[in-house]
Amino acid sequence: MSKLLTESDSLKVIRRILEGSPKRRFNEAVDLVVVLRGIDLKRDPNAKINEVVELPHSPRNRKTKVAVIGKGEFLSKAKEAGADRVLEPEEIEAIAANKRALKKLANEYDFFIAQADVLPKIVKYIGPVLGPRNKMPINLPAMAVSQLPDLIEKLRRSVRIRTKDQPIIHTKVGSRDMKPEEIVENIRAVLSAIERKYEDPSKISRVYVKTTMGPAEELPLAAGRR
């Protein structure tokens, strides 16, 4: 886990934003904003980050939804594992005929898993919509169907972190009803993934945390990381 955060200082900030923000009629998310430095995303496409990070604690304000595309035993196993939706290739083709329906599908589900030998048949239908949303299906061979339950469970605890045009990462790391200690552990998991990508903690310039409708507050980083 990342050592960029000091436990006591981080907990103070998290408690302050949770206790200081007015209560809403819904369970607000806790969002993380990481500002990077020394990275030129325009000149070096490899500098972009696009990863799925498994969090130690699942945010409770919204269920992460997983859809599985495949056929036969693959879909049966997905149903048993509690996938939020299972789709056969023919269903994907039918949905793709209606652009509005395809966009609705893309927006409704956070992650997609596809049976490896099925994906080439459907990529032309879903690629133009899922690609820009960074939701292209995770490939899983039919012979690895026994791994589906663990993969679905892992994705339910995961968030995607990515840079777009600017060296800034926005992601969800919790919900307002979580313990401050759990949120700090989730933040550490995200920072660890960023550190592994760039192999240099000093690439992380500033870190902010906020509730959905609350102001952002900066998290102090450990001294001497440069």
Curated annotation (Swiss-Prot):
UniProt keyword Ribonucleoprotein, yes or no: yes
Tagged with keyword RNA-binding: yes
GO cellular component terms, A-Z: large ribosomal subunit
Protein name: Large ribosomal subunit protein uL1
Stored PANTHER family: 54S RIBOSOMAL PROTEIN L1, MITOCHONDRIAL (PTHR36427), LARGE RIBOSOMAL SUBUNIT PROTEIN UL1M (PTHR36427:SF3)
Subunit structure: Part of the 50S ribosomal subunit.
UniProt function note: Binds directly to 23S rRNA. Probably involved in E site tRNA release. Protein L1 is also a translational repressor protein, it controls the translation of its operon by binding to its mRNA.
MF annotations from Gene Ontology: rRNA binding; structural constituent of ribosome; tRNA binding
Example GO BP: regulation of translation
Keywords: Repressor, Ribonucleoprotein, Ribosomal protein, RNA-binding, rRNA-binding, Translation regulation, tRNA-binding
Lineage of the organism: Archaea, Thermoproteota, Candidatus Korarchaeia, Candidatus Korarchaeales, Candidatus Korarchaeaceae
Family, per entry: Belongs to the universal ribosomal protein uL1 family.
